[in-house]
Amino acid sequence: MTRTVLVLNGPNLNLLGTREPQTYGRRTLGEIADECAAFAETRGFAVDFRQTNQEGQLLDWIHQARGRVAGIVINPAAWTHTSVALRDALAAVELPVVEVHLSNVHQREAFRHHSYVSPVALGVICGFGSLGYRLALEHFAERFEAAA
């Protein structure tokens, strides 16, 4: 089995560190990517960390993941609440998925309370800032160790 986890990030996450830091924190997406890579390396696997503001690009990356990665960590951002296509793509590739959100979406506007992704994810981590990514990767580290 491949020991790579695809970490996908949706729209506006390229603005982390400057966009609403009181909600999303001060870490940049580049810093989060570096932290994810360093954590994965200590646990013996790799991450492929990506971000896009184009929904079609995100869907293409998900489709290409089948047979190439062991699982997906995804912060779908606003597409969480709007994209049936994203939900369908994640279901179609039949990979384990962990959904991550920096903020606690359930403490925010009502429209953020619904996720199209959650029904096809193994779990959801929200409200812990950038730590959520590491927690999601910890899940995959434990899967790899159990399979060894």
Swiss-Prot record:
Catalytic activity: 3-dehydroquinate = 3-dehydroshikimate + H2O
Pathway connected to this protein: Metabolic intermediate biosynthesis; chorismate biosynthesis; chorismate from D-erythrose 4-phosphate and phosphoenolpyruvate: step 3/7
Sequence positions that bind substrate: 75, 81, 88, 102-103, 112
Keyword flag Amino-acid biosynthesis: yes
GO biological process, one term: chorismate biosynthetic process
Annotated InterPro entries: DHquinase_II, DHquinase_II_CS, DHquinase_II_sf
Database matches in Gene3D superfamilies: Dehydroquinase, class II
Record-annotated site: Transition state stabilizer: 19
The keyword Lyase is assigned to this record: yes
Active site: 24 (proton acceptor), 101 (proton donor)
PROSITE patterns for this protein: DEHYDROQUINASE_II (PS01029)
EC number: 4.2.1.10
Alphabetized UniProt keyword annotations: Amino-acid biosynthesis, Aromatic amino acid biosynthesis, Lyase
GO molecular-function terms, A-Z: 3-dehydroquinate dehydratase activity
Pfam families: DHquinase_II
Protein family according to the UniProt entry: Belongs to the type-II 3-dehydroquinase family.
Oligomer and partners: Homododecamer.
Record function comment: Catalyzes a trans-dehydration via an enolate intermediate.
Protein name: 3-dehydroquinate dehydratase 2
Naturally occurring in which organism (per UniProt): Pseudomonas aeruginosa (strain ATCC 15692 / DSM 22644 / CIP 104116 / JCM 14847 / LMG 12228 / 1C / PRS 101 / PAO1)
